[in-house]
Structure formats: structure tokens, C-alpha cells
Amino acid sequence: MKKQDRRPEILVCNDDGIEGEGIHVLAASMKKLGNVTVVAPAEPHSGMSHAMTLGVPLRIREFRRNNRFFGHTVSGTPVDCIKVALSHIMKVKPDLIVSGINYGSNTAMSTLYSGTVAAALEGAIQGVTSLAFSLTTYEHADFTYAGKFARKLARKVLQEGLPEDTILSVNIPNVPEADIQGVRITGQGRSRWSEDAIERNDMYGNPYYWLNGTLMLLDEGMESDEFAVRRNFVTLTPLSCDLTRHGFRSTLEQWKLKK
């Protein structure tokens, strides 16, 4: 059977865990396009970036929602989920991997910490066209428009494809569809976190710490994903698995370092 004559195989993952609302919206949306396989962390794994589990076994379990089979959980990270899904759970290679829909944006430097984005990048490493979707809120989330846009973009990407080792990181404002200003193709903005470790004491008086901080934007303009999404634009940012700063290589050559 030719690829265009069958329904595409779509793998759905996230980093918020299989009970997160976003993955249920995303899976339902993708089922209108193809055959969906859901493989997600058993527990939330936000901020895990491209971590994978070594030295301890991974456990795979079936997960039921409303008394119906929904997908599989993996006792590991989002990247573990992609690896296990491709090597063990899925019988055929997927045509598309979609990760999300994440609680909270994954823009600027937050991209580097994101398990949602890392799952999509792992898909690209494995040679599968991959997308990452994030909603710009941690509370009072309305995934309605995000699910609708995810399906629209996924359909287009299935038709057009993406360059090798490239994903799209998609950030969607948490506003009604009528308030969406449009779609912007952006770069990864510049930012940093104002880090703060909040100290508390346990029942024995021993200190422990919660990491906290605020994302500070270091550039402005509609070319920045964070700047644009704050102005209610959906942003599409092409990301590559190649982290090389190619423009700096010629400068390094001029250093003429010797062994």
C-alpha cells in the first residue's frame, strides 16, 4: 500500500505525564488525521530536557482513561518514551511524532530545558518528522484552539515534510481564538532565568530548597518567539539537532591552537 493510500501513523508524547490534559486533547485531535499511538511518562517530567534513563530498568504499563485503553506509560523521561515507543511498542515507524500540548511556553532559553521539545528532537534524531506544541500558561488552560491548530499544522507537515534533523516548536497563546493575532515564523529568543533557590526547613530543622525564577527577555521584536507569543501570535520556530555555532568556527581556526 502506498503511503498516500493509508492513514498516517502518529506517535503522541509529552513531558507533563499521561494524565496531563494537553496530551488527551492532542491525541484526540490527531485521531482525526491518522492512527494514534500514545506513549508518555507515567509521572510529570517537566524540565528534563534530553535526559534519558541509564542504570535502572524502564517499566511499561497500559493506561486506561474512562475505562478505555488510551496508551502506554513509561517509567522514565520523554526521551525514554520516544526510544521505547519506536523500538518496542510501535510495529511500524511513525510518519509523525507530536509532543505536547505542554503546560507553559517553551520559548527562548526555556527551549533548552524542555522535555516537550526534547521528545520531538529525539524523534528527529530517529528520522521521524516531529513537532512540539506548548500553551503559554500553567493554570486555567484552555487547549481548545491549541488542539485545533495542532491538527491544522500536522496535516500540512504530513503533506510538505520538514528538513532532516529539524523540528517545529510551536507556542500558542492561552486566549480565545478570536484574540489570536496570527501566525509568526520566529527564531529562538534570547532570555535568561533570574534564579532563586527558596530555602525551607524540614521537620528536623534541615534546610531544603525549591528552585524558582522569572524568565527575563533579552531581546525585543517579532523575530523572537517569546516576544511574539506574548502579543498573542502563534509562533513556529524551526529548531535543529545541530547545536554547532557554525559562524564561530572560522574565528576558532584563527586561534591556531596546537597540541
Curated annotation (Swiss-Prot):
Short name of any one Pfam family annotated for the protein: SurE
Cofactor info, note text: Binds 1 divalent metal cation per subunit.
Gene3D superfamilies in the cross-refs: Survival protein SurE-like phosphatase/nucleotidase
Catalytic activity, as annotated: a ribonucleoside 5'-phosphate + H2O = a ribonucleoside + phosphate
Subcellular location: Cytoplasm
Cellular component GO terms held in the UniProt record: cytoplasm
Source superkingdom: Bacteria
UniProt similarity note: Belongs to the SurE nucleotidase family.
Protein name: 5'-nucleotidase SurE
